[in-house]
Structure formats: structure tokens, C-alpha cells
């Protein structure tokens, strides 16, 4: 049995916690950056981990004056870079073990 706690936030609470206006959240959802449960803004339920993504999206939009399409692309590229870095680290560790056993 898992002890994972899942916290869901309604639109009002999500906006408060992320410190972004509802109009931003609607744009973020419309561009597929986050995907809440529910079919309309008043019924949307967000997972708490989506707060970080929404905050990043709003910051990119505001600070770099990116359109929402550009924000979505930038976040996808950031995620891909993070995945590649993690894979690179795993491969370095495997190589280190291989080289270590070959020299021993």
C-alpha cells in the first residue's frame, strides 16, 4: 500500500498558490502546458506538482515576453535537456563501473 499523498487544488486555490491570475492559468491549460482534471475552469482540479510548471510558464511569459506557444516549447526543451542530463549521468556511472572493472 502506497503512502503517497495527492493534493488537488481548485482554480481559485491554484491561482493563489501559484500567485498568477486565472487568465494565465487558462492560457497555460489551453496550450497544453498543464492538464487539469475537469472540463471547464470552474470544475478544474490541479495536482500540487503542477504549481511549479505554472509558475515557470508565467515567469517565462512575463520576464522574456514570450507568447504562450513559445513558453510551451521552452518548457518542453527544458524538460528534454533535464532528461538528457539524467541519462548522461547514468551512462557516465555505468561507464565508470565498466572502466573500473576493466582496470582492476
Walk through the language-model features, giving the residues of each:
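Arg/Lys-rich, alpha-helical DNA-contact motif
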Residues: 2-12, 16, 26, 30-31, ...
Amino acid at each position: 500500500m502506497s503512502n503517497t499523498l495527492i493534493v488537488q487544488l481548485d482554480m481559485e486555490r491554484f491561482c493563489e498558490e501559484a500567485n498568477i491570475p486565472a487568465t494565465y492559468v487558462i492560457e497555460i491549460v489551453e496550450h497544453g502546458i498543464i492538464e487539469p482534471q475537469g472540463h471547464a475552469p470552474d470544475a478544474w482540479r490541479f495536482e500540487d506538482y503542477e504549481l511549479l510548471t505554472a509558475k515557470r510558464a508565467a515567469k517565462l511569459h512575463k520576464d522574456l515576453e514570450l507568447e504562450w506557444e513559445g513558453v510551451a516549447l521552452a518548457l518542453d526543451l527544458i524538460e528534454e535537456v533535464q532528461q538528457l542530463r539524467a541519462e548522461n549521468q547514468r551512462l557516465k556511472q555505468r561507464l565508470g563501473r565498466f572502466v573500473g572493472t576493466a582496470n582492476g
